[in-house]
Amino acid sequence: MRVYFPALSSDLGEEQISLRQAFVAVPSPDMGREDVEVLEDDAQVEAALASLILLRDAPTHAYARIVLATDIQTDSVPSGTGVLEVNNVRCDWNDVVAILADDGETSEQVRRVIEAEDQDQADHAISDLWEFPLQWFDVSERDALREILK
């Protein structure tokens, strides 16, 4: 199952990803391929938003949205369809199939989200940030990405 983990730049240097919430896309049986792709994108967006929350609570990390796309088996998926949150899921780098992240050029936009003083500022900053899609990195590029984000 594809599970999307929000991450911080420090996670890129760790051997194991710490236990945290993650997101999965669970399509309904009647969904077409295109609808499933939209649902997967929505799960990535939820994980990216969650990465901003992690960053807000730990602002010494690089200002970047980071999502780890993993293929893992988990029994903790709640019943239902749509984008679902799963908790207390553990994975390691062998499970990661891709890293979705800002490439460092959006650090100012991410900083504006993190430092927003009210909901209106945050909403505007997030809207501006979402003009920049996450970049796809192969898991073998994790050290290079860590250097980019320093």
Indicate where each model-derived feature is located.
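Glycine-rich, aromatic-bearing surface loops/beta-hairpins
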Residues: 70-150
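Short, extreme N-terminal segment that most often corresponds to the first beta-strand
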Residues: 1-27
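Positively charged, polar, low-complexity stretches
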Residues: 19-76
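Charged/polar, solvent-exposed surface patches and flexible loops
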Residues: 10, 14, 49, 53, ...
